[in-house]
Amino acid sequence: MKRVLTALAAALPFAAHAADAISGAVERQPTNWQAIIMFLIFVVFTLGITYWASKRVRSRSDYYTAGGNITGFQNGLAIAGDYMSAASFLGISALVFTSGYDGLIYSLGFLVGWPIILFLIAERLRNLGRYTFADVASYRLKQGPIRILSACGSLVVVALYLIAQMVGAGKLIELLFGLNYHIAVVLVGVLMMMYVLFGGMLATTWVQIIKAVLLLFGASFMAFMVMKHVGFSFNNLFTEAMAVHPKGTAIMSPGGLVQDPISALSLGLGLMFGTAGLPHILMRFFTVSDAREARKSVFYATGFMGYFYILTFIIGFGAIMLVGANPAYKDAAGALIGGNNMAAVHLANAVGGNLFLGFISAVAFATILAVVAGLTLAGASAVSHDLYANVFRKGATEREELKVSKITVLVLGVIAIILGFLFENQNIAFMVGLAFAIAASCNFPIILLSMYWSKLTTRGAMLGGWLGLLTAVVLMILGPTIWVQILGHEKAIFPYEYPALFSISVAFLGIWFFSATDNSAEGNREREQFRAQFIRSQTGFGVQQGRAH
């Protein structure tokens, strides 16, 4: 595969596909001092928030969940900030720029998982858990095996996602700011560690909230200026875009991104169920006081994200008009300077001048910081809370657990920087696709069935969960992205790019079969305990709130 701008596609779920659709060579741009100054303002402000947060982090609850004192509205903004990546902004708008209507269809994949979280997961998750989703999965099952599986699933997802984000950050900053790749990776790693190490969930939450507000403001302004240009008429917008786009009226037709129904279904399932299995997203539901606030969190987050993806559609069509038809934004060969991923950035310059271009570039960097901070905290909690405090050293004090968590943050940060260096010139787009497939095939089935299926047993959850995880990994390796494009084989053993349809099926079937055939005394006891769990999940009786949470 040609060297592509993985900076944005890497941050996009199932980005292997997006990388093909919006590829463009990485070209280091001149140093953008406006962007650097605005980003430094953001860094200074957020480090001030981290210092403020560090004075309020006194307990395990404060560190992992901000004491459970985040409101539903604040948490909704933070979730949106955690989920809306640089790829969502620049990558989706680039897809619209190149493929038109197909870009809108693709962006819907990011939203379809949220109704599942709202109606099936958020309330029960908050009522049953404390710090991580493993608390919920192990509520009536054996603590050790389930927490090990959940922690492994979380850490694999976090590691893959983190590598992709670090490499993407380096490439993106090299492109937008003109900074050296290695400096960019170290900068992201150090800031990430500082936010999480000193400020915990409270600092991470406010970094995500600020990033979400800035991103929504920037995208809203760009969309407003585009619509102003066409007299606030969507008919004029589409007509002018079709008139200047090389594909003409074809940009208004669907069907160009996914070639067969199996791939389309697998991609959709992976996006839908993967979202509901991402550890750094699920962890956010423990930062609110009760199930009602958890539901409100999803409601607000879905609203913010839905609005945002509508804006990216307008921005993409605006870029077709104002950027694609303007020779000033093209190189000697007629291609967009910096690649198609720069479409929204060039549009920022077209509608707001150099100052607004600097603002959008700084927001793109802030976006990456918000995402990696959430990932790091989720990985640290999986090690310190799930593995250390509940498996390897049961009865550990809060102080010991927090110490392990902070050591893990440092280790994760250093590893992320090193892997960012090692994977600089590699095609890492598949990593986020694999992360979503694992989240959908391991984490999601266990969370869902542990809350809803009374006959689930530890044996079924363990065997089915591991089968789902391994199937996702093996099929991804044997598929076209890794087997052909990376390893260089002539033909893929597994013909489909997205394994989720098959790995999710294997996980659910495995959990059902091994639970149904489990006639052990332990399995029967676990089934009997479902009623007490169900009452707790529905009523919240016994849930600790606020600072005692």
Curated annotation (Swiss-Prot):
Q: Which residues cross the membrane?
A: 33-53, 77-97, 103-123, 148-168, 183-203, 206-226, 262-282, 303-323, 355-375, 404-424, 428-448, 464-484, 493-513
Q: Which Gene3D superfamilies match?
A: Sodium/glucose cotransporter
> Which positions carry the signal peptide feature in this UniProt record?
none
Bilayer topology term: Multi-pass membrane protein
Q: Which Pfam families match?
A: SSF
What does the UniProt keyword field contain?
Cell inner membrane, Cell membrane, Ion transport, Membrane, Sodium, Sodium transport, Symport, Transmembrane, Transmembrane helix, Transport
Ubl conjugation in keyword set: no
Entry annotated with the keyword Oxidoreductase: no
Which cell locations does it reside in?
A: Cell inner membrane
Identify the NCBIfam families for this entry.
Answer: PRK09395.1 (NF006903), PRK12488.1 (NF009135), sss (TIGR00813), symport_actP (TIGR02711)
| PANTHER family named among the record's database cross-references | CATION_ACETATE SYMPORTER ACTP (PTHR48086:SF6), SODIUM/PROLINE SYMPORTER-RELATED (PTHR48086)
Function text: Transports acetate.
The protein in question is named Cation/acetate symporter ActP
Q: Which species expresses this protein natively?
A: Salmonella paratyphi C (strain RKS4594)
Its lineage opens with: Bacteria, Pseudomonadati, Pseudomonadota, Gammaproteobacteria, Enterobacterales
